[in-house]
Amino acid sequence: MIIAIDGPAASGKGTLAKRLAAHYGLRHLDTGVIYRAVGMGMLALGAELTDEARAAAVAAALDPKTFDDPALKSQAVGEAASVVSALPKVRAALVDFQRRFADTPPGAVLDGRDIGTVICPQAEVKIFVVADPVVRARRRTLEAQSRGEPADEAVILADILKRDERDRSRAAAPLKQADDAHLLDNSHLDVESGLRAAIDIVEAVRAGRLR
């Protein structure tokens, strides 16, 4: 079984995907981490983030061992990831990796921006997670503070709105809800309530009550 979870930054889709994978005994891939790793690599090189050829080379040479680096969660790396993920050659370099992961039995839960529309359009279950931008900014602020990083909630909100616009308007795989994806508004759900809502969707699809 392949479960595709898409949505904007800080919507809670990553936590939801990880918990959903554990519930069903599936592997989990946070595809945003892959793009963050490319962004971090470009920052380390001091390269222009819009240098498509260099970014594609970084993507092709990614080491999965770096996916657990805490530095990937920084605001600067997140912004860099949003820029490089809009580059068609970067996306092309990473598509095969993601599809191989998803197609390996017994299946997987993948979360990102274009899982249900581009990476795994054949996924049995597709969920599109949304949350109010103000709520998302608050979550990001608390996450940064928990890591001991300075965080200005107003600045983070502005960055989130800017990223949303960039993700939705990019030419390559823009952020959008797949026609057959089920909407889950995570604005006011805690982790357990969000997981329960997602499980209800999965079970309804498997039972034929939802399509």
UniProtKB/Swiss-Prot annotation:
EC number(s) reported in the record: 2.7.4.25
Organism whose genome encodes this protein: Rhodopseudomonas palustris (strain BisA53)
Coarse class of the protein's main subcellular location: cytoplasm
Superkingdom of the source species: Bacteria
Pfam families given in the database record: Cytidylate_kin
GO biological process, one term: pyrimidine nucleotide metabolic process
Binding site for ATP: G7, P8, A9, A10, S11, G12, K13, G14, T15
GO CC terms, sorted: cytoplasm
Gene: cmk
Keyword Cytoplasm recorded: yes
Keywords: ATP-binding, Cytoplasm, Kinase, Nucleotide-binding, Transferase
UniProt-recorded Gene Ontology molecular function terms: ATP binding; CMP kinase activity; dCMP kinase activity
This protein's name: Cytidylate kinase
Residues annotated as signal peptide: none
Record field: catalytic activity: CMP + ATP = CDP + ADP; dCMP + ATP = dCDP + ADP
Compartments it resides in: Cytoplasm
Entry similarity comment: Belongs to the cytidylate kinase family. Type 1 subfamily.
Statement: the UniProt record of this protein carries the keyword Chloroplast: no
